[in-house]
């Protein structure tokens, strides 16, 4: 484990589409679980340290689909776990609508380089 390193997960949500509070909550949950599973598979040390230190999560406003895809690509280039969430389209949104991106868990400083300027939801 990397001592003296803080770990977190950031969920970036679309702000250019209308979602009910319940739909938004479920999309954030999908992103958090999916990104954590990616970390567990590919960055086990990061996942375990994050898990042992309280699983810090932050939800931020991300803008459009294009914006979210840009953040996801930046995270992949930094070798961070990423989950891109697309809705099934069974209730409020058309099928395959991108709703959220989960980044991390990973070192906070690496994630902040991508999401540090985004506003909290």
From Swiss-Prot:
GO MF annotations in UniProt: peptidyl-tRNA hydrolase activity
Reactions performed catalytically: an N-acyl-L-alpha-aminoacyl-tRNA + H2O = an N-acyl-L-amino acid + a tRNA + H(+)
Question: One short Pfam family name for this protein?
Answer: PTH2
Cite the entry's keywords alphabetically: Cytoplasm, Hydrolase
Q: EC annotation?
A: 3.1.1.29
Specify where it is mainly localized: cytoplasm
Would you identify the family this protein belongs to, as annotated? Belongs to the PTH2 family.
* Described purpose of this protein according to its UniProt entry: The natural substrate for this enzyme may be peptidyl-tRNAs which drop off the ribosome during protein synthesis.
PANTHER family, sorted? PEPTIDYL-TRNA HYDROLASE 2, PEPTIDYL-TRNA HYDROLASE 2, MITOCHONDRIAL
Q: Can you name this protein? A: Peptidyl-tRNA hydrolase
Q: What is the native source organism of this protein?
A: Staphylothermus marinus (strain ATCC 43588 / DSM 3639 / JCM 9404 / F1)
Source lineage: Archaea, Thermoproteota, Thermoprotei, Desulfurococcales, Desulfurococcaceae
């Amino acid at each position: 484990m990397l001592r003296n390193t803080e770990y977190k997960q950031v969920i970036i949500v679309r702000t250019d589409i209308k979602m009910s509070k319940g739909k938004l909550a479920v999309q954030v949950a999908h992103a958090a679980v999916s990104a954590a599973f990616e970390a567990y598979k590919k960055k086990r040390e990061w996942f375990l340290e994050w898990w042992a230190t309280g699983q810090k999560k932050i939800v931020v406003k991300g803008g459009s689909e294009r914006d979210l895809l840009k953040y996801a690509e930046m995270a992949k280039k930094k070798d961070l776990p990423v989950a891109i969430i697309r809705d099934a389209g069974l209730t409020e949104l058309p099928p395959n609508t991108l709703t959220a991106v989960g980044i991390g868990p990973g070192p906070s400083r690496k994630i902040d380089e991508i999401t540090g300027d985004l506003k909290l939801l």
